[in-house]
């Protein structure tokens, strides 16, 4: 048994048993719950109005990590930063490139919790190549609105028969279940990454560059058009630029990346004065 004070408005459980008790109590009293992790995305969309808040920031930690088997199992409140630091030790990554919205809303890094990342299904530039967050979830445990435990999947890629619930809860914004544990596929980091910076293209030309590049056999892993009115804020490595630009990223083994960058430059018909390579 746990000793929770149900008169408080913010619950900060440290165990799954406490989460179950909180949800069951709120269900019996018909009290809606707002679910929070590290609040990195609470300024996105319409705020949820509720009497009680379930704060999962103390329900954190890496449960299991097997680099050789390419998976990590974590509690939902675990900071993304902590997971990335652990993966860095083995030159591995979350290939879907989770976003860091902290700079946008608070001016400092706050990449949030892994539960928030999965609940929102927000992926980065590599999404068109490797898939979204839901494509990297091997399994999960969660608690539904009645306080019942739900389990799906496991720790290997082909571990689901029937409907894959991981696909359903990813991007559900906490409306279907409170995620408690997640098993996630990890992948090796690319050996090299280079970015083609094309200077001052107008919008139509930039879209043409991106369309050709992303459908090219050079296999880019990211692309973006950066309008000129953002130019004053642009800094990438040592490059500063005060006009519009298009950036196209290529990753992989060093020799392969060099060859593909050169080939893509030729395919796009770029002159040396029009581009930089970072």
Question: Each predicted region: which residue ranges?
Answer:
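Noncatalytic alpha-helical scaffold of FAD-dependent oxidoreductases
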Residues: 1-278
């Amino acid at each position: 048994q746990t000793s929770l004070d149900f008169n408080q408005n913010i619950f900060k459980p440290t165990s799954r048993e406490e989460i179950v008790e909180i949800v069951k109590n709120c269900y019996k009293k018909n009290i809606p719950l707002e679910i929070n992790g590290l609040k990195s995305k609470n300024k996105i969309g319409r705020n949820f109005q509720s009497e009680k808040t379930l704060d999962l920031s103390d329900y954190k930690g890496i449960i299991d990590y097997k680099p050789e088997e390419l998976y990590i199992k974590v509690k939902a409140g675990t900071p993304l930063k902590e997971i990335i630091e652990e993966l860095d030790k083995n030159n591995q990554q979350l290939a879907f490139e989770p976003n860091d919205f902290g700079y946008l809303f608070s001016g400092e890094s706050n990449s949030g919790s892994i539960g928030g990342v999965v609940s929102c299904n927000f992926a980065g530039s590599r999404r068109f190549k490797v898939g979204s967050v839901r494509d990297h979830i091997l399994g999960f445990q969660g608690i539904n609105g009645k306080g019942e435990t739900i389990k799906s999947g496991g720790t290997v890629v082909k571990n689901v028969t029937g409907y894959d619930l991981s696909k359903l809860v990813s991007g559900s914004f906490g409306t279907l279940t409170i995620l408690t544990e997640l098993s996630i596929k990890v992948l090796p980091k690319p050996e090299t990454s280079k970015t083609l910076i094309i200077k001052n293209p107008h919008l139509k030309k930039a879209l043409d560059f991106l369309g050709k590049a992303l459908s090219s056999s050079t296999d880019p892993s990211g692309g973006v058009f950066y309008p000129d009115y953002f130019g004053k804020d642009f800094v990438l490595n040592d490059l500063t630029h005060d006009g519009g630009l298009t950036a196209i990223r290529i990753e992989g083994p060093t020799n392969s990346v060099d060859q593909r960058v050169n080939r893509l430059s030729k395919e796009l018909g770029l002159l040396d004065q029009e581009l930089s390579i970072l």
